[in-house]
Amino acid sequence: MKKILLASVIALAAATASADDYIEHQVYSDKNFEQNRAKAVKLLEKRGYQIHKIDADSHWGKPVLEAEAYKNGREYDIVLSYPDLKIIKEKIDY
């Protein structure tokens, strides 16, 4: 029974990782990706951030852009929905 449970957990983890990779691939394959990325940079710069990097990722199974940015000497982790670029999460990275 323990072996079956362990195998199930491993299979589920692999399937989840595969789904996340597929979502990332979809974002990077979007023909408007570079435009949307540039819009995200401008949006965050207007809010006073200096952008360190922005990458495609998934958040709760949805495509997002994850940004590392600095403001007032502090580092922030910011998650924007993709492609509409609404801020989902904005927190100080300790």
Q: What residue spans do the PLM features occupy?
A:
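Conserved histidines in hydrophobic membrane contexts and catalytic metal-binding motifs
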Residues: 62-68, 79, 85
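Short acidic/polar mixed-charge low-complexity motifs
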Residues: 72-76
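Amphipathic, hydrophobic secondary-structure cores in small proteins
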Residues: 52-55, 59-66
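Classic N-terminal secretory signal peptides
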Residues: 1-19
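Post-signal peptide N-terminal regions of Sec-secreted extracellular proteins
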Residues: 20-21, 46-49, 94
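Short, non-transmembrane alpha-helical segments in secretory-pathway proteins
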Residues: 27-53
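Cleaved targeting-peptide boundary
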Residues: 18-27
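A short, surface-exposed interaction/processing loop segment used at functional sites
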Residues: 85-94
